[in-house]
Structures are given as C-alpha cells and as structure tokens.
Amino acid sequence: VVGPECMALALFFLCAAYATNALSPKIAGHFQVATTIIKLIPLLLMAVVGIIVGLVSDQGVLLENMANPGAETTGNPLFGAIVATAFAYEGWIIATSINAELKDAKRNLPIALIAGGIIIVAIYLFYYIGVAGGATVEDLMNDGATTAYLNIFGGAFGNILNLFVAISCMGTLNGLMLGCTR
C-alpha cells in the first residue's frame, strides 16, 4: 500500500489506537499483551527451528556462518549499535509513564524493566543464531531474514511473516499510545 491509501490506513490505525486507549485502557492493555505474544511467535520459531536446521543440515550453514562472518561492513559499526540501543531504550521512557497505575511500582517497575530487557536480549540472541542457521551470510546480507524464513519454513510462512510484522507494528503503535496518552 503506497500513496494516499497508505496515509489513510495509517490515520485509521492511529485514530483506532487513540480511541481504544481513551475509551478503555484495560482493553488496550490486553491488546498490548496479545500483540507482544504474537510478535514472539516467529522469533521463537526461528530461534528453535533455525538452530536445529542449521546444525543438522548437510551444508552445516550455522557452523559455517559462525566460522566465516562474511565481508566487512562499511561505515562505523559502533554508531549503528549506539543508534539501535538508543531506539531500544525508547520503550523504557514510555514504560515509566504508567508507573502510577502499577501495583507497588517502586518495586515492580525496576524488576519488569531489568527482567524484560534480559528476556528480550536472550530471545533476539537465539533468533539471530537461528537466522544464521537458515541462510548463508551472503544471502542474509543481500536479502535479509526473509530468506532464512523461506529456506526453513517455505513460501507460505515466508509470506505470513509480513502479517506478524504488521501485528508487531500495531502493538508498537498501541504501546506508544498507551504511554503517551497518560
């Protein structure tokens, strides 16, 4: 979807997220939990299946990718890491905006932020190892993680991946709206 249709669709989802959060924060919270769980499905599937396929495949793709990381990247990798880290911590600011609604926020919010951060790091670490088991480094650099999904799960799941990405984006929009409207 491109052009004015894209803007109309974005405006619809923005208004829907605002209306949901304004009229029923409880429903918005349940929607947030649901989208988070749905977002984890392809990540965990790729982590588990990708590692297994990468280890038992005839080509030994996972072991080859770990031994040969591919061509050097151009640019400053530290800058890319800093930008990604700053973007990741954006959610922490939003999470603290709902502390008044949490039970024993002084105790529970730091636990949630630290435990949540550790869990997300672990999930993405295993996800990227699984992706490395699904395609060669060169294929991943040229075509992205979709290649690994197509190689491991076939065409149908490779296309369903876009649905998971859309649900993830709606969850992000809802989460931002949930925190920013407070």
What are these model-predicted stretches?
Residues V1, I114-N174:
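TM-loop-TM module centered on a large, flexible mid-protein loop between adjacent transmembrane helices
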Residues V1-L9, P42, N99-A105, I111-I119, ...:
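Helix-loop-helix connectors at the membrane interface of multi-pass transporters/channels
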Residues V2-A10, L14, T36-K39, T73-A81, ...:
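Residue-level signature of transmembrane alpha-helical entry/exit and packing/kink sites
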Residues E5-S57, L113-G117:
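Membrane-interface loop-to-helix entry segments
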Residues C15-A19, F79-A86, I160-N174:
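Hydrophobic alpha-helical transmembrane segments of multi-pass membrane proteins
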Residues L23-V33, W92-I123:
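Hydrophobic, small-residue-rich membrane helices and short re-entrant helix-turn-helix hairpins
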Residues I37-N68, A86, Y128-A135:
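Hydrophobic alpha-helical segments and their helix-loop junctions in multi-pass secondary transporters
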Residues I93-L102, G158-R182:
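Membrane-helix boundary/coupling elements in multi-pass transport proteins
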